Amino acid sequence: MHPVLPTGIGVLVGPMIGVVLVTHGRLADEFKAATEHVVGPQAAFRTVCIGPQDDMEARRDDILSAIKSVDSGQGVILLTDMFGGTPSNLAISALESGKIEVIAGVNLPMLIKLASVRSTAKMQEAVDKAQEAGRKYIRVASKELTGG
């Protein structure tokens, strides 16, 4: 049996894919706030913010601790702001086949999609749906409006 996770608002939820946002600056906190503004409070969802003067080993330990805190046995998805950046590289160091995945280039549509599928989807399906949603909503307004 998997643990029941507290949501932070007195509601308990069953096993789900955990989410950890790892970004430059406070972006992770803001993405979490924006996600919860749209879809409501999220259980098993943590942030790790990387500052320019931070001790990177300490931040890596924070990532590992965040992973442990959101892992209910269904897997954990780490989302980072930019592939090749320090947050992404630290997240990739925790990659574990079938258990921990990293998606770089996080955006709000991706997070909203993950929020809607992570309690029922398998890991790979959730990763694929998040990536698809992230790509789908990148649009150039003038091209959309003129059909060009």
List the predicted regions and their residue ranges.
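N-terminal loops that bind phosphate or other acidic moieties
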Residues: H2-G148
